Amino acid sequence: MNDQHWGPSISADIVVIGGGTAGIGLVASLLKRSPHLNITVIEPDSRHFYQPAWTLVGGGAYNVENTVRPMASVMPRGVNWVQAAVTGIDPDHGRLILSDARTVSYKNLIVCPGLRLAWEKIEGLEETLGQHGVTSNYSYRHATYTWDQVQKLRGGKVLFTQPAMPIKCAGAPQKALYLSCDHWNRAGVLNNIDVEFNLAGAALFGVATFVPPLMKYIEKYNARLAFNSNLVKVDGPAKTAWFDIKDAEGTVTRQAKTFDLLHVVPPQVAPDFVARSPLADAAGWCEVDPHSLQHPRYPGVFALGDICGTSNAKTAAAVRKQIVVVAENLLALRKQRPLPLKYDGYGSCPLTVEKGKVILAEFGYAGKLLPTFPLDPTTPRRSAWWLKATLLPWFYWNGMLKGREWLTRLSRVD
């Protein structure tokens, strides 16, 4: 970074990059523990979204307007909110550069900007998304279009896609399939619809325990699975999508498939300012110790949420646990004490297999099952639907973003 191009500087103590679930939740938890902390949050967006409900919006089970609030209404009191984007990180000198050329110096840095949806990596997608039957529940603007198109469809060919991992909420691509098929089944038109799920990977779900119960629903809805099939191009007006298909020998061929409805999940990458920084791992994500969530080379830096280069599921449930780990470990570091807490990789994916029933998949590193409740986690339950559709959204706005920590029991360092 060249000093001569920098604008006015901001001197800060604790700096948090990102005002999403991880950023706001962490700041609220830090202030609960130590109300006099000097915290600066850098977040350009004027709105805050509850993204886990967008799958429900696409299935006609949630009002999209209830998934967004003004950022100012969720920003904890007493925080210095800098409404700008970060364009560079210089951890060797403890400073950031912003989109308006200002610089921010810090003593401790928390990296939690989320990830970037790389729509542009699929040729033709940005031009046609939200029209011609091309949609995505990964977008606030288009989740309602999903439901509109699902209701209108009475027959034809439907393609659902899932890109290469990692992505946020790895179960969301198939949730779109299940809720759509459930609607068509109830409407009596499912037999007129050819449903195909194209996955860039070779497994329906990353934790093998949950594959058999999910396969029962794939079979119930008569959906066809196309593994190692990666969406690379879309022509909306021509109702055609192209996939790169890899065979057992690793040979890739491109195949065109027509559709009446296409639900796309875009590739997902780290924001450029992280991927280009010294904080990044080889894949561009923020490198951290998988248990302490502290950067291995810059001890004053922690990360949490989707940006982490850890193998856990990128979900809000993971963030709920990570918040406590980072809050406790950061405060211990500032007091020059050993870091007390370790993260076990917990993540949760409430798989909405039909309207009114959810398979609640909870697991940690290496796919270890970590159920919260003493029930068979592979059984679809109405109670889990209530948790997903009613309790968790309420707790998000009224608990998690206000520093209230629920079901966050964690392991302490031996």
Predicted regions and their residues:
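A conserved FAD-binding loop/helix module that cradles the flavin
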Residues: 304-353
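Glycine-rich, N-terminal phosphate-binding loop of Rossmann-like dinucleotide-binding domains
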Residues: 19, 100, 113-114, 245, ...
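C-terminal auxiliary extensions adjacent to catalytic cores
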Residues: 2, 360-414
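FAD-binding core/adjacent interface of flavoenzyme oxidoreductases
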Residues: 1-12, 80-188, 252, 263
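A Rossmann-like FAD-binding core segment of flavoenzymes
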Residues: 36, 79-89, 93-96, 104, ...
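FAD-site-proximal beta/loop scaffold in flavoenzymes
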Residues: 126-154, 258-321
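Beta1-alpha1 glycine-rich phosphate/pyrophosphate-binding loop at the start
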Residues: 2-80, 164-208
